[in-house]
């Protein structure tokens, strides 16, 4: 397969992974809690946990939605 074909396939797989399931069911949240609210201007960095890389969560702090490393409480 040519490198152009591989890039196209990778792009399509990436888009497919970001699409919400057609059934309308939300994916489960990732484990852990969001750390305390950061002191910074409003920013919308993510829509849900799955729009964040790795184990990061999409944390909502009022007008701020950003990807953050989770904290775990025993």
Curated annotation (Swiss-Prot):
<dbReference type="GO" id="GO:0044278">
    <property type="term" value="P:venom-mediated disruption of cell wall in another organism"/>
</dbReference>
<keyword id="KW-0929">Antimicrobial</keyword>
<feature type="disulfide bond">
    <location>
        <begin position="46"/>
        <end position="58"/>
    </location>
</feature>
<keyword id="KW-0964">Secreted</keyword>
<keyword id="KW-0732">Signal</keyword>
<comment type="function">
    <text>Damages membranes of susceptible bacteria. Has antibacterial activity against the Gram-positive bacteria B.megaterium and S.warneri. After 45 minutes of treatment with this protein, B.megaterium have no visible pili and are smooth. Has no antibacterial activity against the Gram-positive bacteria B.thuringiensis, S.aureus, S.clavuligerus and B. anthracis, or the Gram-negative bacteria E.coli and A.tumefaciens. Has no hemolytic activity. Does not inhibit the proteinases elastase and cathepsin G. Is not toxic to mice.</text>
</comment>
<dbReference type="GO" id="GO:0019731">
    <property type="term" value="P:antibacterial humoral response"/>
</dbReference>
<feature type="disulfide bond">
    <location>
        <begin position="52"/>
        <end position="67"/>
    </location>
</feature>
<keyword id="KW-0044">Antibiotic</keyword>
<protein>
    <recommendedName>
        <fullName>Omwaprin-c</fullName>
    </recommendedName>
</protein>
<dbReference type="InterPro" id="IPR008197">
    <property type="entry name" value="WAP_dom"/>
</dbReference>
<dbReference type="GO" id="GO:0005615">
    <property type="term" value="C:extracellular space"/>
</dbReference>
<comment type="similarity">
    <text>Belongs to the venom waprin family.</text>
</comment>
<feature type="disulfide bond">
    <location>
        <begin position="34"/>
        <end position="59"/>
    </location>
</feature>
<dbReference type="GO" id="GO:0005576">
    <property type="term" value="C:extracellular region"/>
</dbReference>
<dbReference type="GO" id="GO:0004867">
    <property type="term" value="F:serine-type endopeptidase inhibitor activity"/>
</dbReference>
<dbReference type="InterPro" id="IPR036645">
    <property type="entry name" value="Elafin-like_sf"/>
</dbReference>
<dbReference type="Pfam" id="PF00095">
    <property type="entry name" value="WAP"/>
</dbReference>
<feature type="signal peptide">
    <location>
        <begin position="1"/>
        <end position="24"/>
    </location>
</feature>
<keyword id="KW-1015">Disulfide bond</keyword>
<feature type="disulfide bond">
    <location>
        <begin position="42"/>
        <end position="63"/>
    </location>
</feature>
<dbReference type="InterPro" id="IPR050514">
    <property type="entry name" value="WAP_four-disulfide_core"/>
</dbReference>
<dbReference type="GO" id="GO:0045087">
    <property type="term" value="P:innate immune response"/>
</dbReference>
<feature type="domain" description="WAP">
    <location>
        <begin position="27"/>
        <end position="71"/>
    </location>
</feature>
